[in-house]
């Protein structure tokens, strides 16, 4: 079962792994020493309605916590470096557009399925929550021509972009993995940044991007979890990669 085909919660169409990830973020927020504070995931989980126990267990809490913090740090560093154009690919119930302290000129594009984006935006709007940056939803499936939809929504491929594919790449078929990287590379201006978590036994993303003039680095998932003092038991054997286009 992947994030692309896992069954959704009743009446919402939101896939179970996205909901499980939101539950893990809720648990981290309520822990004694949270790596981040995400007050909005609880709103989304509540709005989604009842879940089966096995659905909530799809995401490993310690791994999700460390991964969320790692991507938070990536975004904040990119923003501090002057990147004002942010693209989140298939973010699910991610709430960074509402919870991170973005600079005033930041524009955040979220590319995801229409029902997912509508559910998230409507739930948070009803709760009186407003984004902390200019928020632009791009309702399109990643299997479709999402670069065209992204450009139509106001994205500028001439400006440096911070790209993020969190919890996505390893769940794509190999052909779609290649297509995703090719499109990101094609629409990335010099100085753009990228962050992804990938399968340790999957394609060599670092090598692929380095061959296309990206300066890349990688960290094994257990090392990221150790950095943030989270238990790696049961966590995927992933690799966190990030880099900058030269």
Swiss-Prot record:
Biological processes per GO annotation: methylation
Top EC class, one word: transferase
S-adenosyl-L-methionine recorded as keyword: yes
Positions annotated to bind S-adenosyl-L-methionine: 112, 141-142
MF GO annotations: methyltransferase activity
The keyword S-adenosyl-L-methionine is assigned to this record: yes
Gene3D superfamilies in the record: Vaccinia Virus protein VP39
E.C. number: 2.1.1.-
Annotated keywords: Methyltransferase, S-adenosyl-L-methionine, Transferase
Cited PANTHER family: S-ADENOSYL-L-METHIONINE-DEPENDENT METHYLTRANSFERASE YKTD-RELATED, S-ADENOSYL-L-METHIONINE-DEPENDENT METHYLTRANSFERASES SUPERFAMILY PROTEIN
NCBIfam families in alphabetical order: mthyl_TIGR00027
Family, similarity comment: Belongs to the UPF0677 family.
Function comment: Exhibits S-adenosyl-L-methionine-dependent methyltransferase activity.
Protein's UniProt name: Putative S-adenosyl-L-methionine-dependent methyltransferase Mflv_0168
Protein source organism: Mycolicibacterium gilvum (strain PYR-GCK)
